[in-house]
């Protein structure tokens, strides 16, 4: 089974501490953290012995980045979690109580500062996809954003903007295509591939498309159909916004349904068939049929775009507005809207209001449509303090205040023999 019932459980906010995916998410993040700890401890020993080389400095930056990235995943999802920053020689050494979220963020700040100081601004094409200063600084901005720390969020995001390393030259409808990989607006992108020898490998590829692909049969068995969009989301787009058709994948419910322009998707002219109950699949996980035939329907070769320059511009806009610098906020916002608008001057007019409240709503709207189905909408609602209001309006009435965090995996609590304490209201 691919766990369609599990997807519905999370979508309806009725998950429990015993759900297996909680343990998997927790365990995978900590596995990476422990690997980073080993690398950093080994480099520290070389530093003490005065034997560090240039590659050690870069490796230190990369390991620090990934440790921060994983702790950010954990603190956003679970809140207080154990903070382990040393090599684990025995499992008992990791059996420690939860650390406050503030302390976790202190470690994240420390690690990202190390990454920023250690990583280069660019790499040669031979090393496409390796971590850079821009990735570290952009992730730092995102962590400040989650804390609504406007001053540090502004400094970090505008540091990246002012460097001029990234651009929005790639049209929006090409960003998530095969040709759009590692484009000028991609700051942090996981590199995945497929080969004739390993056409369906998750070792060198990813499940990004498989998890979100069309849930159908035969040629339309493209994935599990998780992370579907709603009509509520479709209605959020302004009239004529081309990002709608680049984000929402239209489909028919059966082969007997007619193929119409409204359910046909560019650029491949396909009208998938699925019995799914959601309104739209994620078009950002939609793959080229020619590559499906060569490798597999599941799209393991597709890179995962994790931080885009448009996101950084919107972080700059949001923090500038909150700091009372509307002109700068409008400029960053307009750069994002201008790329989406393209040559069609009749759509997406420039936002000109300098009223802080109105501009705040415009920026929030832009985050929703520019970054639609890219993982962070829920966390935006949480940090803005409007999650319950928005989710209830969308029909998700099971959502309660406790759902700002996930429950700790019951398996981890059991293994700790009571050292770990469950999050409030899940006990």
Q: Language-model segments: which ranges?
A:
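Long, intrinsically disordered, low-complexity segments
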Residues: 29-32, 107, 117, 176-231, ...
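Conserved, well-structured interaction surfaces
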Residues: 2-78, 93, 99-102, 112, ...
């Amino acid at each position: 089974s691919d766990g369609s019932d599990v997807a519905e459980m999370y979508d309806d906010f009725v998950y429990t501490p015993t759900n297996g995916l909680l343990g998997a998410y927790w365990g995978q993040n900590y596995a990476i953290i422990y690997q980073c700890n080993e690398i950093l401890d080994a480099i520290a020993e070389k530093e003490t012995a005065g034997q560090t080389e240039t590659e050690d400095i870069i490796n230190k930056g990369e390991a620090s980045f990934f440790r921060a990235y994983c702790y950010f995943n954990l603190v956003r999802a679970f809140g207080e979690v154990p903070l382990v920053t040393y090599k684990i020689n025995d499992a008992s050494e990791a059996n420690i109580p939860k650390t406050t979220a503030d302390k976790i963020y202190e470690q994240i700040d420390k690690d990202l500062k190390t990454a920023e100081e250690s990583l280069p601004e660019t790499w040669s094409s031979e090393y496409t996809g390796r971590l850079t200063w821009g990735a570290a600084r952009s992730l730092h901005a995102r962590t400040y954003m989650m804390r609504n720390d406007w001053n540090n969020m502004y400094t970090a995001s505008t540091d990246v903007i002012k460097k001029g390393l990234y651009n929005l030259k790639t049209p929006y409808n090409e960003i998530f295509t095969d040709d759009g990989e590692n484009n000028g607006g991609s700051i942090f992108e996981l590199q995945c591939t497929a080969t004739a020898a390993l056409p369906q490998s998750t070792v060198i590829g990813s499940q990004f498309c498989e998890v979100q692909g069309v849930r159908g049969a035969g040629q339309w068995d493209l994935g599990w159909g998780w992370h579907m969009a709603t009509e509520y989301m479709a209605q959020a787009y302004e009239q004529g916004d081309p990002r709608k058709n680049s984000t929402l994948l239209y489909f028919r419910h059966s082969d007997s349904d007619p193929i119409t322009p409204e359910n046909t998707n560019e650029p491949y002219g396909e009208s998938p068939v699925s019995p799914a109950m959601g309104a739209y699949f994620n078009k950002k996980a939609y793959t080229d049929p020619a590559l499906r035939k060569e490798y597999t329907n599941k799209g393991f070769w597709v890179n995962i775009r994790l931080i885009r320059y448009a996101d950084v511009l919107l972080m700059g806009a949001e923090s500038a507005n909150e700091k009372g610098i509307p002109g700068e906020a409008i400029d960053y916002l307009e750069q994002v809207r201008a790329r989406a608008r393209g040559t069609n001057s009749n759509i997406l007019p420039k936002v000109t209001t300098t009223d802080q409240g109105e501009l705040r709503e415009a920026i929030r709207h832009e985050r929703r449509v520019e970054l639609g189905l890219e993982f962070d909408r829920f966390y935006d609602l949480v940090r803005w303090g409007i999650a319950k209001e928005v989710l209830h309006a969308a029909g998700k009435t099971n959502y309660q205040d406790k759902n700002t965090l996930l429950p700790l995996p019951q398996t981890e609590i059991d293994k700790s023999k009571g050292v770990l304490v469950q999050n409030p209201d899940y006990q």
